[in-house]
Every structure is written in C-alpha cells, then in structure tokens.
Swiss-Prot record:
UniProt: a 1,2-diacyl-sn-glycero-3-phospho-(1'-sn-glycerol) binding residues: 152
NCBIfam families: lgt
Homology family: Belongs to the Lgt family.
Gene: lgt
UniProt-annotated location(s): Cell inner membrane
Source species: Campylobacter curvus (strain 525.92)
Protein name according to UniProt: Phosphatidylglycerol--prolipoprotein diacylglyceryl transferase
Taxonomy of the source species: Bacteria, Pseudomonadati, Campylobacterota, Epsilonproteobacteria, Campylobacterales
Length: 270
C-alpha cells in the first residue's frame, strides 16, 4: 500500500494546539475558503465594474457568514442528525462546542441548509442597503465555488465525509477499507470545474441572475455525480431508487435553478 493510500495513518487532522484548544486543519481551510471567496469578490467587483464599495462588500460577507453558519447547522440538525427533537428542545446545545467538558468544536453542517441561510441573509441585506439582489447573487455565483474548493479539501484533511468502498489505485485507507477520496472529487467538480465555467461564461451574461441560476444547475449536476462515490450519510442511507439525501436535495435545487433562469430571462428588459 502506497503512502497516498495510507495517508490518514500518517496525517493528524489537528494542525496545532493553542491554549489547550485543538486547531484542526478543517478550521484553517474554512478560514481560507472565506478569505478566498472575499478576495475573489473584490477582484470581480473591480474587474467587472460592479457597483458596490469595499466597505459594503465586507459588511455583506459578515451578514452572509452569519446566515451560512445558522442555515448549515440548523439544516444538518433538521435533515441529517436524527436528533432534531432533542436539539430544538435544547436549543443551547445547537452551537455548544463542548462535549463532556472537552472542546470538540461544532460538528455537523449541511451545504443545502447553508444555501437557505445564504439566500435569506442576502435578501435581507439587499432590502436594508437597497442593493440589486440578482446582481449581488451573480457575484456570489463566482465566489462560492472558488471558496468551496478549500472547504472540501478541509473535509478531506479532517478525515470526514468518506467515499464509498473501492479498489481503484488512488483509494484512501479508512479504518482498513479502501475508499474513494470523494471530498477531492467534490473539490474538483463542484468547486474548480464550476468556477472555471462561470468565470469564462460571465462575459456572455445577458441578464442579472443568470450566473446564480447557472451555478445552481452546474453545482447540483456535479454534486449528483459525486454522490455516487460518496458514502451515504450515517443513519439515513439511501432514500429512494438508490439515491442519497444529497442527491434528492440536489434535484430540488436543480429545478429551482432552471425555474429561476427562465423566470428571470422572461422578465428581462433589454
């Protein structure tokens, strides 16, 4: 077995310890994801002459981060945890980073829940600061997949969201079973590939909202494919017709993107 196959046995998901708290590589990658997304946003604002100031953009990212964290955590609890009743009757436990007195961080986030939180935060922000909603969402469509790359690499380094069992030569040994490095597949397809397509397509954009609608379609297609290599969520398994919860939610998001595209295109005024 090569060093790559056995990488988890030679790699510590904890990067370092600071004042008694373990700092995981996932946390570092999460911060890199945020900073890279914000950096990309500022680049496209200047490059494409998008009418929003740096100060307002920084403020917007603060709003979005709150929405994403709330949506991702609540979405995970409601859909994946299997303990929704407990958490919603003990709300102080939702963001409790301690378990039996030990700091373990906040575990369990849902991408699709994050999308809901992101959209609500963006809508509220645009109403308060009188911004063009669809123009701002198009900007986010370029930044999200760029930051997403680091997020999925973080999942890989954190040794979570394992792939399905396989015999391919690049599989990763997880507790004695060779598995697909599905987190890296997702970083490549749902992150890098989607970003590159939108990056080059943005110059051909015909109406505000086109990029975010296209992002929804591209992301869900990539996620649907990657889910075939990813182990279904524990406690949920396959939902129907051999499809995972991630695939079911992606189907809904796909049609949401299609409907948004044709609605915006129909109402576009040249």
């Amino acid at each position: 077995m090569s060093t790559w196959n056995d990488i988890y046995n030679h790699f510590d998901p904890v990067a370092f310890t600071l004042f008694g708290f373990s700092v995981h590589w996932y946390g570092i990658m999460y911060i890199l994801a945020l900073l890279s997304a914000l950096g990309a946003a500022k680049y496209f604002v200047k490059k494409d002459n998008i009418p929003i100031t740096d100060a307002l953009l920084d403020n917007y990212f603060f709003w979005v981060e709150i929405g994403v964290i709330l949506g991702a955590r609540l979405g995970y609890i409601a859909i994946y945890s299997g303990e929704a009743v407990y958490f919603f009757t003990h709300p102080w436990q939702i963001f409790n980073p301690f378990h039996n007195g030990e700091f373990v961080g906040i575990r369990g986030m849902s991408y699709h829940g994050a999308v809901v939180g992101f959209l609500l935060a963006t809508i509220l922000f645009c109403k308060k600061y009188k911004q063009n909603l669809w123009q701002l969402l198009d900007l986010c469509a370029l930044c999200i997949p760029f930051g997403y790359i680091f997020g999925r690499i973080g999942n890989f380094l954190n040794q979570e969201l394992f792939g399905r069992a396989t015999d391919v030569s690049w599989g990763i040994n997880v507790f004695g079973i060779l598995r697909h490095p599905s987190q890296l597949y997702e970083a490549a397809l749902e992150g890098l590939a989607v970003f590159l397509i939108l990056f080059f397509y943005r110059k051909f954009k015909k109406f505000d909202g086109e990029l975010i609608a296209l992002y929804a379609v591209l992301y869900t297609l990539a996620r649907f494919v990657c889910e075939f290599f990813r182990e279904p969520d524990a406690g949920i398994g396959f939902i129907i017709f051999g499809l995972s919860m991630g695939q079911i939610l992606s189907i809904l998001m796909f049609f949401g993107g299609i409907l948004a595209y044709f609605f915006l295109k129909k109402n576009y005024i040249k």
